[in-house]
């Protein structure tokens, strides 16, 4: 479980976090709806939701992120689970909810995923809808890193013109473990842009490649980005760069590579750029350096210095996950977000204000 230790280093805007003991949650706050929050449950042990649910609000617990699918199982309170007012949920004896304790990676420390064929968490998630009263502000440290740095894109959208976007990065950006294409974070963001700017013609291309770090990104840039002649490029690296020595990219080289990507994109296309950070992988994974905060900070620093927009996925993720287990959000149990995790990325892009 992540904790609140990092809050002291954040500005006040980022410190309005959604957890007991760190939250701003007066009874006067407007009720909010949490949809499809994911959690895995071990035996009959309790697990935390991100927030404490309202007693009076409707609660739904099911087997799929999206409701109403042919395979969706709706779990019943008392029969399948117990949920208390503090936001703790647990399986009942004889529950139909899968027991995460039977996952092949459960309890493994410093595990190497290549030794466990078929690893993953997808069959173990339950998804919870509930209402809460927690007040929250987007953890965007500086609004100037948002839409203010995307004036050409905003102008084109408002004028109803064609806007070409390329999503560039690693397997997360490629859509890693989203259950359907429409739930990939940048697909969700594009759909929201189309609602906000109905006269504009918005095209988005998936230019991401699984397993890539910034080194491979530079090698693929011409084919995946420059040839598309984009107006806006979303750049998300760091997950593979941050891996331990011998598998990743050193921090200073990572920042240097981001600057090189930005320079080449601007020189060749004139496109505006959004950099976005990544979240911490499973801390029990052997290959992670578990220094993602430094890579997220480097991404933000490059965005500031190179006058790019910045989507702060790292702190958004940490704020929502502070009461939760890493496995609650990891579709592959390593470093791919599940559908709820893709929603967190989507929210970070929404915070740009475009």
Spans of features found by a protein language model:
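Solvent-exposed loop/turn segments at secondary-structure junctions
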Residues: 171-175, 209-215, 239-244, 271, ...
């Amino acid at each position: 479980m992540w904790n609140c230790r990092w809050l002291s280093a954040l500005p006040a805007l980022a410190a309005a976090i959604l957890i007991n003991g760190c939250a701003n949650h007066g009874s006067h706050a407007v009720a909010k709806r949490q949809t499809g929050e994911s959690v895995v449950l071990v035996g009959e042990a309790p697990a935390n939701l991100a927030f404490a649910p309202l007693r009076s609000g409707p609660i739904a617990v099911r087997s799929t992120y999206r409701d109403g699918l042919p395979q969706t199982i709706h779990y019943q309170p008392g029969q399948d689970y117990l949920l208390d007012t503090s936001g703790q949920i647990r399986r009942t004896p004889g529950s139909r909810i899968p027991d995460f304790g039977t996952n092949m990676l459960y309890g493994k420390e410093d595990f190497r995923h290549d030794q466990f064929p078929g690893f993953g968490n997808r069959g173990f998630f339950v998804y919870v809808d509930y209402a809460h009263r927690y007040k929250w502000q987007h953890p965007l440290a500086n609004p100037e890193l948002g839409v203010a740095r995307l004036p050409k894109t905003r102008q084109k959208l408002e004028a109803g013109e064609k806007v070409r976007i390329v999503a560039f990065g690693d397997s997360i950006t490629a859509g890693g473990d989203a259950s359907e294409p429409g739930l990939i974070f940048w697909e969700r963001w594009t759909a929201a842009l189309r609602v906000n700017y109905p006269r504009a013609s918005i095209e988005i291309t998936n230019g991401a490649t699984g397993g890539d770090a910034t080194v491979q990104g530079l090698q693929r840039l011409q084919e995946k980005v420059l040839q598309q002649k984009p107006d806006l490029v979303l750049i998300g690296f760091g997950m593979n760069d941050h891996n331990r020595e011998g598998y990743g990219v050193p921090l200073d080289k990572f920042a240097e590579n981001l600057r090189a990507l930005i320079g080449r994109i601007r020189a060749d296309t004139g496109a505006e750029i959004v950099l976005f950070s990544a979240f911490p992988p499973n801390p029990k994974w052997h290959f992670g350096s578990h220094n993602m905060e430094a890579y997220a900070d480097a991404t933000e620093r490059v965005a500031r210095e190179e006058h790019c927009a910045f989507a702060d996925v790292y702190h958004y993720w940490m704020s929502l996950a502070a009461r939760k287990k890493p496995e609650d959000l990891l579709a592959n149990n390593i470093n791919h977000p599940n559908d709820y995790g893709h929603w967190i990325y989507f929210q970070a892009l929404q915070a740009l204000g475009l």
